[in-house]
Amino acid sequence: MMSLQLGTAGKERQLAEKSRDLQNVSMTEGSEEVSEMDHISDRPDEKDKPSENLQTDSLYKMDTEKWDGLEQESEHSQDPPSKPDEQEVTLVCEGPQVSQLSPSTDESTPIPESLTHKLNYWHAKMGLQMKELGADHGDWLERINNIIQNINNTESTVKSLLTEVISLENQSKNLEDSDQEADIEEKITEIRRQLKEVNIKLTQVDACEEARELKEKLVEQIESFHKEMNVLNSKLEMYYTQGSDADSHNSEDVDTEQEEPLVPEASPSLSASPTPPCSAVWKNALKLFVIVYVVTITGLSCYILFVDATFLFERVLPSVLGHRTMWDLREMMAPFLNLEAEDLLPS
């Protein structure tokens, strides 16, 4: 199990290093692409168009291959190794000492379910984020290619218009008829209108700003992913250190148990810890009951003597026994209550 944890930790560290390298490469490539876009927008000739398209295609292929490789590595890291042969090989490579302590460590330090759930959650989250980053990166490259195509189209239209203007100027030098002059003026006005439309389109579509915004978003997502990977690595290192400490403590406990001498059977009866005194507990409970009983009786007697003498017979007993039973008791006690003092005296 320790070898599995070490393998997963090593894979996660390799993935974090690759994500860092990819971040640096993507930032440098993005800056180069933006500089190339600016350089392309300033060029007047059409000679370098195939080379630019080839550069963008090659960059796109390289980035997609890198993202696909990282996604495959993340998917492989999600699936733990299930082959028993590989586990046996790793256990044999650890040495004879580890093989001797392996049953005690496996029995004493099982992997908690919370750790496996957290690892599965982080692996799934990393895979989703890698897919999202790959999709965003591909979308960003497609948009940049579209922007470059729009710039090339505008350059071609402007160049064609310039050639038409030059041809019209050459024709205007050799003019003889007024009809040809009117046609040339109409063509010039149409060319001006087309140039105005091209300028409006260029002002509406700000290619450089859009590319920068997309690149900033991609960089932010990569940075957040890098932070989460650092957090995951720190958690994995913490769990690994806790597992190693637990293994060391368990091994020390086993050694101490083996070194302790055997105690004879008569010793537990002699050295048994004294049981808690139950008689003392019952005595305390009895004392509390007696105190409460005495306090209640004295309180009732004081209330009856000094406050209300009929409290017991007119309030407590009727509420407890009922009015019907009270009337029956009064009828039974009536002859004794109506006795006079002379009847009680001896004759």
From Swiss-Prot:
InterPro entries, per the entry: SMCO2/5
Domain of life: Eukaryota
Protein source organism: Mus musculus
Bias (Acidic residues): 253-262
GO cellular component, one term: membrane
Modified residues (Phosphoserine): 178
Biased composition range(s): Basic and acidic residues: 10-21, 36-51, 60-86
Keyword Membrane attributed: yes
Coiled coil: 139-238
Compartment list: Membrane
Transmembrane feature ranges: 288-308
Annotated region described as Disordered, given as residue ranges: 1-89, 243-274
UniProt keywords, alphabetically: Coiled coil, Membrane, Phosphoprotein, Transmembrane, Transmembrane helix
Ranges of Low complexity composition bias in the record: 263-273
Name of this chain's protein: Single-pass membrane and coiled-coil domain-containing protein 2
Predominant place of localization: membrane
Topological relation to the membrane, as annotated: Single-pass membrane protein
Record flagged with keyword Electron transport: no
